[in-house]
Swiss-Prot record:
Tissues expressing this chain: Expressed by the venom duct.
UniProt comment concerning the protein's domains: The cysteine framework is III (CC-C-C-CC). Classified in the M-2 branch, since 2 residues stand between the fourth and the fifth cysteine residues.
Lineage, uppermost ranks: Eukaryota, Metazoa, Spiralia, Lophotrochozoa, Mollusca
Disulphide linkage map: 53-65, 54-61, 58-64
InterPro entries: 4Fe4S_Fe-S-bd, Conotoxin
Cellular compartments per GO CC: extracellular region
Coiled-coil residues: none
Subcellular location as annotated: Secreted
Record's protein name: Conotoxin TsMMSK-011
Keyword Secreted in record: yes
Leader sequence residues: 1-20
Main location: secreted
Length: 67
């Protein structure tokens, strides 16, 4: 039984190698709205142009200023 399972696993790995799976490691996933330009932080009323960050309401305006 174990040898049949090993053969099946080997065949599956040869037909569909793990390197063919697309990984999300090289894609930025933390700011998808900024990537698609859905949020214009420069025009936000909470954006501080001197500090180049948002003073409050960080769930609306990105990036947040450190407290």
């Amino acid at each position: 039984m174990m040898s049949k399972l090993g053969v099946l696993l080997t065949i599956c790995l040869l037909l569909f190698p793990l390197t063919a799976v697309q990984l999300d490691g090289d894609q930025p996933a933390d700011l998808p709205a900024l990537r698609t330009q859905d949020i214009a932080t420069d025009h936000s009323p909470w954006f501080d142009p001197v500090k180049r960050c948002c003073s409050r309401y960080c769930y609306i305006c990105i990036p947040c200023c450190p407290n």
